[in-house]
Amino acid sequence: MMVAEMVADRVLARVTAWLLAVSDTTDVASDRYPPLVEGPAQPRPAAFAGVGGYFDALSWRPQDTEGQPAAVSWFRPTAHIVDTDPASPLQQLAAVVDCANGVGAILDPNRFLFMNTDTVVHLHRLPTGTDFALRARASVGPDGLGVTTAEIFDTTGFVGTSAQTLLVRRR
């Protein structure tokens, strides 16, 4: 198990990961979902328009999912995680997965905060490439808590899932 912490006066962030030994299971590999095909990009949701910072570090391409139970967006990181080193597909995917609560948002961000307090990622294979899609949906309970779940894709197919606990507050 690997654990890394970002510390200032206190722990600001913690990453815990199991480093698993891999073996060849090519002959029995299967995907739960068919690959997602990127369509024409739709406008970024109005509530997120003009928001800079983190959003400037990604090419965000929402998809038309009218009438479907989950929202879909494709992403490509546009900024380096470390200026001098190119990011691996796994590192780029980690930056994208943080967006799931925005992709699956069911609340107006002008009226509500819905901060993800954690992110859990389960991969069934390593991602490839630089473009990743999230198919995300959120649920909000009656007590200020919620959850966003997402299926994660690269351009070749399903990669894994994520879950985020949401802290929901009125603005």
Regions flagged by a language model, labelled:
Residues 1-171:
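Terminal targeting signals and extreme-terminal segments of soluble enzymes
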